[in-house]
Amino acid sequence: MFQFVKKKNEFLKFARLGSRAFTQNAQKTHSKGSNIALVSSSLLSVGMIALYYNVYGPSLSAGTPKEEGLHFIQHDWPQSKVLSGFDHASLRRGFQVYREVCSACHSLNLIAWRHLVGVTHTADEAKQMASEVEYEDGPDDEGNMFKRPGKLSDFLPPPYPNVEAARASNNGAAPPDLSCVVRGRHGGQDYIYSLLTGYTEPPAGVEVPDGMNFNPFFPGTQIAMARPLFDDAVEFEDGTPATTAQAAKDVVNFLHWASEPELDIRKKMGFQVITVLTILTALSMWYKRFKWTPIKNRKIFYQRPIK
């Protein structure tokens, strides 16, 4: 009887060992299969991304400076700093440059007279400038269109009535709208400034066709737009010397504001958000320590009851 029980215990022990070994082998096999599946799916994902980028990704080409244009010169713009905004005196001068020079060919379709209030001009000055422009309105009670003086709600008038008229007046190339030109160009204000101040005589051996102008910062180095800025082309009311560089700087600042009129507001809001979040983070850390310090430092002792 004792031998039977002993053999039975040995059999159960052997069965337990076999079951444990089978379970471990199954876990290893499952883990190995999971790793293989994970590696396969990762390789498949990387391959699909590489295939998509190869088919639809941008093509790289090594262009010469003549084909791509010279790299723009980087400048220190106040609005590009974290804690500073637009120079409003420069914005006022820049609007004057746009109005007296650039508006002859380029439009600002997204800027209304009311947008200038508090930025470049007072409300009375903006109303006065708007009233000097006649806008077509209507129809009246008889169904006829009529002309009226401009209001603050009107947008700045375009130089041409439509795109076709713009093309016809510029040898088939319509001048672009300048509302978002700074944000829509690689290099932003640095590129626009370099382009405006980069007009020069072509080097020896370079032929420029009629109707084209040489500018090394423009792709292809030949641009249809003639040089727009010259020294003393405008007369600033604040007495600032109207050099080509100064006029280009001011008009680029104004065009940057036209592309991002909410930039200063975003910076102020971001600074306020960071300040509030910093205070809330400090308060939450203090409250966490206030609540958890007694709990973490608490010691519990078991004292046996005295009989």
From Swiss-Prot:
InterPro entries: Cyt_c-like_dom (IPR009056), Cyt_c-like_dom_sf (IPR036909), Cyt_c1 (IPR002326), Cyt_c1_TM_anchor_C (IPR021157)
A molecular function GO annotation: ubiquinol-cytochrome-c reductase activity
Tagged with keyword Cell membrane: no
Bound cofactor: record note: Binds 1 heme c group covalently per subunit.
EC number: 7.1.1.8
Reaction catalysed by this enzyme: a quinol + 2 Fe(III)-[cytochrome c](out) = a quinone + 2 Fe(II)-[cytochrome c](out) + 2 H(+)(out)
Name recorded for this polypeptide: Cytochrome c1, heme protein, mitochondrial
Species of the source: Schizosaccharomyces pombe (strain 972 / ATCC 24843) (Fission yeast)
